[in-house]
C-alpha cells in the first residue's frame, strides 16, 4: 500500500504524534482523551511523518530496551535501513534501559513515552489503530 493511500479503520481510537511539540495525543471517537510528552527522533534520525497504523503490540522483558511495551508501527525510518538487528521500523515504546528526557528530540526515530503511559496505551489500543505523525 502506498503511503498516499487512505487508511481506513473500524476502531474509534486514533493516535497523533506532533513532532514540533513533542507530544502524543490520543483520541477516542474524535474526542481528545489524553496528551503525553514524548521523546522523538533527533535531526540526523528523524521520526518519519505520515499516516501509519499500529502493526502489533509487543510486551518486552524487563531488561529489554524500550520496556515495558512497544507498539510497532507501519512506519519505517527514512534514514536507518536496520536498527539493533532488525528493520528500521518505527515504534512507540517505553523509556526503560534507553532513557531520554520527555519533550526532547534524541531518539533514532522511535517515539519514546513514559513507562506508565505505555501501560495505559497498550490497555486501550492495538493493531489497526491509525497513527498520524506530523510536524
PLM regions: where:
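A structural motif detector for short, solvent-exposed N-terminal "entry" segments of globular domains
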Residues: 2-42
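Exported/periplasmic cell-wall-interacting domains
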Residues: 2-12, 42-51, 58-135
Amino acid at each position: 500500500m502506498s503511503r498516499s493511500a487512505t487508511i481506513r479503520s473500524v476502531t474509534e481510537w486514533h493516535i497523533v504524534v506532533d513532532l514540533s511539540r513533542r507530544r502524543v495525543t490520543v483520541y477516542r471517537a474524535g474526542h481528545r482523551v489524553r496528551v503525553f510528552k514524548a521523546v522523538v527522533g533527533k535531526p540526523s534520525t528523524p521520526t518519519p511523518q505520515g499516516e501509519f497504523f499500529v502493526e502489533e503490540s509487543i510486551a518486552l522483558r524487563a531488561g529489554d530496551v524500550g520496556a515495558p511495551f512497544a507498539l510497532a508501527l507501519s512506519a519505517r525510518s527514512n534514514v536507518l535501513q536496520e536498527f539493533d538487528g532488525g528493520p528500521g521500523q518505527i515504534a512507540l515504546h517505553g523509556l526503560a534501559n534507553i532513557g531520554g528526557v520527555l519533550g526532547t528530540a534524541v531518539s533514532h526515530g522511535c517515539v519514546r513515552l513514559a513507562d506508565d503511559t505505555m501501560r495505559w496505551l497498550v490497555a486501550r489500543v492495538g493493531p489497526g489503530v491509525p497513527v498520524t505523525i506530523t510536524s
